[in-house]
Every structure is written in structure tokens, then in C-alpha cells.
Amino acid sequence: MNILLSRILKYLNGTLFLDDAYRFCVFFILHYQDFDSYTIEDISGELQTTPECILKFLKYLGFDNYLSFIEIYQRHKQVRFEQIQERMKNIHVSSYVERIKVSNDNEAFLKKIEEVYTKIHDSKRVILVGALYPMSIAVEFQTDLISFGKTVLQYHTYDKDMIFMKMTMLSLFLHQEDH
């Protein structure tokens, strides 16, 4: 299901412009858990833009108005949470590690996974940096973490505010190895 959050992330991750649409997407991610508590006027004031500029972007996403956007946000937020809950039932990380065979020492590999998990948990936000292909599959990772309240953004060199936000952050570098 191409939920609203993943559509926003696909736009945000792929855009080359620091414009009102980009700022709206970042605002959406930063305030995802309680986004429906904001009016379009609140958001336009915060972003120093107009409601019309926001509505123009929402029309680009296929929405006729802000209310329909909020209704889909609420529905998709609930659906995504239920999807994650269902996926996590009876999951055993060790069995996945056995099947993918990335290491000869599964215990050491599981320990590394736990270290990464702890770093993600302890950070206020996660910034993804990397090549196009690994970034394209990272949208699932982003939607899961954002759904649980963790801010996850892709790094864009043109967004100077991203570098200097005053919060604990973890940067993950994603790359593709040629074999």
C-alpha cells in the first residue's frame, strides 16, 4: 500500500529544490505523530508561506483540500500501525539472520544489530545519507520509524538547517557495493 507517509517521503527524498513543498514535507515528518492538530494556517505561519502554496502541493499529491488530506493521514496512520503490528507478530530476528547468512558469527552480527538499534533509539532523529538505490529501499525503514515517533530524513546538501538542528542525531550511510 502506497500510504501517504511513503508518498511524502518519496517526494521529499527525490526533490532537488528547497521550496515550500520541501518545507511542508519536512514539517509533516517532524510533526507526524500529531499532524492533525495543526490547521493549514498554523503550518503556513510556521513555514512563512501561504495556505494557497500548501494547497497547491496537496493538489499535486491528489487532494482537493486540506481536510481530505487530514482524513487520509489519519486513516493511513492507523493502517500503517496495524501493518507493523501484524508484521511483528511471531518475528524472531535470529531466524532471519540464519536465513540471510551475512556472517559466520551470528551472535556477533546480532550484537551489531542491537548496537545500531540502540543508537537509533537514543537519537532524536536519524539522517540517511547515501546512494540512490539503497535510499530508494530505505522508504520502508523511514515509514516504520516515523510511524513510531522517530524523525528520519534523507540528507540534502542544499538544506543547511538540517545540519545545524540542535538535537541528538544519528547519521546512517547507505551504500551499494559492487561485487
Identify the function of each model-found stretch.
Residues 1-3, 145:
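N-terminal-biased segments
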Residues 3-7, 15-26, 30-37, 41, ...:
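HTH-adjacent hinge/linker in prokaryotic transcriptional regulators
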Residues 111-124:
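Glycine-rich phosphate/diphosphate-binding loops that line cofactor/substrate pockets in enzymes
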